[in-house]
Structure formats: C-alpha cells, structure tokens
C-alpha cells in the first residue's frame, strides 16, 4: 500500500498540470493497488424531505430563496422510505442514501430518522444519510441506530466557499465531519466542479479532504447541475477533460477512498463516463433521480457496464442476507426502469 501523506496545494496543482494521459496512467496504477478496477459500488439516493431549505447555496434548487418550481414536501413516512429501499435492493443497489433539505435536523425528526436507518439495515443494505449539520448527540443517535455513512460535502475550497454559500461556514462543515467521525460513522464528503472556481480551488478542496484526520471513505465528485432559477444557472459548462482530471487527482490523493461519479452524470456521454472509471471513479448512483435531474436510465447504465466489463461490488452488512448477495448480478440485469423518486437534496 502507498503510505499516506499530507498534501499541499502546490503538490495537488502539479497533479492537475500533468499531461492528461500521464495523469490517467498514474491514477489507474494507484487504483489497481487498492481496488479491483472492474468493480463499481452502486448506491440509490432518495430525498426524504424536499424543498424549503433556509440556506442560500447558489447551486441548489431546494433553497427557499430561489424560484425553481420545486414543490416542497414534508418528511416522508417511514413506510414509504422502506418501500423505496426495497425496490432499490431488488434493482441491485447495495447502499441506500436518504437526504433531507434541512440546515440541520430537529429533535422531533430524530425518532423517524433512527427508525428509517434500522429498517433499511434490516433489508441487508448499507445506509447513508445527508441531513445538514449535526451536533454530537444527533451523530451518536444515528450511529447507535446503525447508520453506516453520513454525507456532508465541503463543496469547494475554503477561499471560494463564500462566493457560493453564506448561511453556514466552512468550519461548520468541518465540525460536522468531526462529530460524524467521532460517533463511529463512515464519512462521505466531496465537492462540486463548475461553480466558477479556478483549478487552484479544485486542488485546495481535494487537499482539505485528503488531509482530514482520516480521509473520507467515499468522495463524491459532482458536476454542477444547472437548474433554472438558481444563481448559477448560466454558468459555463465544465470541460469533460477538466472533470476527468479532477477524478484522477482525487484518486491519487485519496487512494483508499471510493471516488463517486455523482451529480452531472446524466450530462456525460458513454465515452466521458468510461474515462472517469479509467481515472479511478468506482462508485455511482443508480436507478434514481439525483438532485432535480434524472440519472441515466438504468438500462443505459447496464449497457455501459457490459461494454466495459464492469461488475457490481457486493457489500455484506451486519444484517445482510446471503441470497441477495448471491443474486445481485442477476437482479440488476433484470431491473426495470422505474424511477425511485422525483426529488432533490
């Protein structure tokens, strides 16, 4: 294994500056040390509470400050969440992610959230939540319920952050990650490419993530999904090669983390997605709608996986059932195109 190092922004920028194929070659070499290059981890994402968020994240259609046409919805009933999780499992997903458009969860919501975690775990799936900021007690309660992962993105560099969000600080985000880690929950944290940031900001974001006391187990790299009504709706498109470079640098700097090809994948053709996998991406969202735009249809994903010879990573949880694991490949091949939800995080 490669010994972990503390990264500087200069070192990260030097990786971004490498010739494209040299960078991909290095990323693929690192990837093969830590992972099976033919395996991809698959998650399904469900918005359990949509819209009316009080924050001002300029990229997000869920903010109550922007007119995006998104209808707000109350916290879903536990039974609805479990039904969606069951469908996701039958379609081949091994991790179920539940997200709520909150600045932070309220005390009245915690019993429902804990029950959701317990019942999804009982299906034999890994669990993930993204609920905004957490205090230490909330993190511990979710950990005690069995939560495997908590997502809380840093979004961009500390220097550029204030151009995008003013309603919570960068330190607020780092503090939440600390509380999650202290509670024994695995960390999922990444960022967004295409906010108007410079290459240096992308490098600085990855340095922040890689230099955490322990790097995130999962690092989602999002391409900005431009939604009409948000302040970033007219941003320039991200050059696919710049996005692929970001995936590759993330893989090199965080070799043991799952690097997730996340929001924006619906904008990518097969060739770009294939290059992202070559650069070290080994996790995706599947069979769902991500944010307010659909991911590629499941059948298109399966066609691409077959073309590339990609297999789905099987995950055994403490409550996992062997039959589901044994028939995972068959289940996903036979999956239909049902959309699990029409929601945003």
Swiss-Prot record:
InterPro entries: Aldolase_TIM (IPR013785), BATS_dom (IPR010722), Biotin_synth/BioAB (IPR002684), Biotin_synthase (IPR024177), Elp3/MiaA/NifB-like_rSAM (IPR006638), rSAM (IPR007197)
Key words of the record: 2Fe-2S, 4Fe-4S, Biotin biosynthesis, Iron, Iron-sulfur, Metal-binding, S-adenosyl-L-methionine, Transferase
Enzyme class: transferase
Pathway: Cofactor biosynthesis; biotin biosynthesis; biotin from 7,8-diaminononanoate: step 2/2
Pfam families from the UniProt entry: BATS, Radical_SAM
Cofactor comment text: Binds 1 [4Fe-4S] cluster. The cluster is coordinated with 3 cysteines and an exchangeable S-adenosyl-L-methionine.
Disulfide bonds: none
Residue positions binding [2Fe-2S] cluster: 97, 128, 188, 260
Cofactor(s) it depends on: [4Fe-4S] cluster; [2Fe-2S] cluster
Stretches assigned to the Radical SAM core domain: 38-256
Keyword Calcium appears in the UniProt entry: no
Family: Belongs to the radical SAM superfamily. Biotin synthase family.
Oligomeric form and interacting partners: Homodimer.
UniProt cross-references to PANTHER family, sorted A to Z: BIOTIN SYNTHASE, BIOTIN SYNTHASE, MITOCHONDRIAL
Listed name of the protein: Biotin synthase
Organism this protein belongs to: Photorhabdus laumondii subsp. laumondii (strain DSM 15139 / CIP 105565 / TT01) (Photorhabdus luminescens subsp. laumondii)
Encoding gene, per UniProt annotation: bioB
